[in-house]
């Protein structure tokens, strides 16, 4: 025991001497860092100041600081990590995802990525390098290519038709109050799960109610723990006092068990199906060393987490804005009636001929990006962002929400004006799906399902607000920024609807 105590004392003394020498002789040169808000405290830095909603708090900080670069970059100390927050489109597009795109293509490592994200090996969390490039190539070609998306057109078409039929039965030709969020969630969950597994989990013709509840709970739990990180990620000593990592470990075990079950079910079937898991298992036979079960589970995880809540939230915000702007919904309906007609449902192939509908989707993504703070990036080496030095290891947060409401970038930025996107170059300013080599590869799928669902709802029903007051547009708490008050609206089927869905 005495020998152990002596070793501890000696280790402490040598560690202290090393720190003193390092500080005196290896002190880094003074760097030009972006301005930082007051209120920094030892150990925790600015963590105590980050009140939800974080994207609004960060914009508030940024607006109070003097920026010699014309605005848009500030620094924070979050525990042991240096974090830069960018709130300028010019800086994000030119400096971060232009000139420094490769340097900033890394991801900071967080606890949930380790225990739920298969030790940071999935496409979102993986460090930039050969493994990530292989994953990106796999997803681009085998999952999100035009060919693969077209293979699942029947799923999107069928799920939207089921949504329309469900609403038609509820409302009929009489004005009826409906709550839309549960139906929109069912739509997006079923779309992704049918692509991956061939199963409908929600609504009619479902296969396993208990498994459906399990899926939704897992997605909610992972989403609740996924953002820019937990305080434990920034102040490692908190691991000694927090149960966070143990909770995440348990969540990772539950998630892995569920995903492995999906793969085993498909592997046990005698005939090869047409789902995404079937396709990945065929690829596994050709290269078993690369297409491991872990790789496949990571892909399923990202598809489910990134492709369900986000699209449902976008649809709910879009409908909320339309109800507050009846002139916009009238204009969109006229466009659909003129170009599609009244004798058939809108189809995905029609979307390219409906520019105003597309502009409504873009304007919704501008005002209500489902990920207001883009997935964090990390500098793999020293670089410069404008006139500022960015040391290696710095975390980068891009506040897409603030950029989308920046008056230096947008005219009347807080107003809902789909017409602004009649100028094609305006769409290039959007950051809803990120920029650069780590932009979201699933943007095409998201825009297809949102465009088709929204167009169908406009085409098939007349919509009104409940009461005379405008729809409440307050933001709720959550990683994908849902509405604080779920949307309820008055719905009435248009006279021709029963003919085209019978």
Swiss-Prot record:
Chief site of localization: membrane
Chain residues that bind heme: 440
GO cellular component terms attached to this protein's record: membrane
EC number: 1.14.-.-
Highest rank taxon of the organism: Eukaryota
Keywords: Heme, Iron, Membrane, Metal-binding, Monooxygenase, Oxidoreductase, Transmembrane, Transmembrane helix
Pfam families: p450
Record GO terms (molecular function): heme binding; iron ion binding; monooxygenase activity; oxidoreductase activity, acting on paired donors, with incorporation or reduction of molecular oxygen
Residue ranges of the TM segments: 6-26
Cofactors: heme
Class of this enzyme: oxidoreductase
Location in the cell: Membrane
Membrane-topology annotation of the record: Single-pass membrane protein
Family statement: Belongs to the cytochrome P450 family.
Annotated protein name in UniProt: Cytochrome P450 81D1
Protein source organism: Arabidopsis thaliana (Mouse-ear cress)
């Amino acid at each position: 025991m005495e020998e152990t105590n002596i070793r501890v004392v000696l280790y402490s003394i040598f560690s202290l001497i090393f720190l003193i020498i390092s500080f005196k002789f290896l002190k880094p040169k003074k760097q030009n860092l972006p301005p930082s808000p007051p209120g920094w405290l030892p150990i925790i830095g600015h963590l105590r100041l980050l009140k939800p909603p974080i994207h609004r708090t960060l914009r508030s900080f940024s607006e109070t600081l003097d920026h010699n670069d014309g605005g848009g970059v500030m620094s924070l100390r979050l525990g042991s990590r240096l974090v830069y927050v960018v709130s300028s489109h010019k800086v994000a597009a030119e400096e971060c995802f232009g000139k420094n795109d490769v340097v900033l293509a890394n991801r900071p490592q967080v606890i949930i990525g380790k225990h739920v994200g298969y030790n940071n090996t999935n496409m979102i969390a993986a460090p930039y390098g050969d493994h990530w490039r292989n994953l990106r190539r796999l997803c681009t070609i085998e999952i999100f290519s035009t060919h693969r998306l077209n293979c699942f057109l029947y799923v999107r078409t069928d799920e939207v038709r089921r949504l329309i039929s469900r609403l038609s039965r509820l409302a009929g030709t009489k004005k009826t109050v409906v709550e839309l969020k549960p139906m929109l969630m069912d739509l997006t969950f079923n779309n992704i799960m049918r692509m991956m597994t061939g199963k409908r989990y929600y609504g009619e013709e479902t296969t396993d109610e208990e498994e459906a509840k399990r899926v939704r709970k897992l997605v909610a739990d992972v989403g609740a723990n996924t953002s820019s990180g937990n305080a434990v990620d920034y102040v490692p000593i908190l691991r000694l006092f927090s149960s966070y990592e143990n909770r995440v470990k348990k969540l990772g075990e539950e998630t892995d068990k569920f995903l492995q079950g999906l793969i085993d079910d498909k592997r046990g079937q005698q005939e090869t199906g047409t789902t995404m898991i079937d396709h990945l298992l065929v690829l596994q036979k050709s290269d078993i060393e690369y297409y491991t079960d872990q790789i496949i589970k990571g892909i399923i995880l990202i598809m489910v987490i990134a492709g369900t809540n986000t699209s449902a939230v976008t649809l709910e915000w879009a409908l909320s804005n339309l109800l507050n702007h009846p002139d916009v919904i009238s204009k969109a309906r006229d466009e659909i009636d003129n170009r599609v007609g009244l004798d058939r449902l809108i189809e995905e192939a029609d979307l390219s001929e409906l520019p105003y509908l597309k502009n409504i989707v873009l304007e919704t993504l501008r005002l209500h990006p489902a990920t207001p703070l883009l997935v964090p990036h990390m500098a793999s080496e020293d670089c410069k962002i404008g006139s500022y030095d960015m040391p290696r290891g710095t975390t980068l947060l891009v506040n897409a929400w603030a950029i989308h409401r920046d008056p230096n970038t947008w005219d009347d930025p807080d107003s809902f004006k789909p017409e602004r996107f009649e100028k094609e170059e305006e769409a290039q300013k959007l950051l809803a799906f990120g920029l650069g080599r780590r932009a979201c590869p699933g943007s095409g799928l998201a825009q297809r399902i949102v465009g088709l669902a929204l167009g169908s709802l406009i085409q098939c029903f007349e919509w009104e607000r409940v009461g005379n007051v405008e729809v409440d547009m307050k933001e709720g708490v959550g990683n994908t920024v849902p509405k604080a008050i779920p949307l309820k609206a008055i719905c009435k089927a248009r006279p021709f609807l029963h003919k085209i869905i019978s």
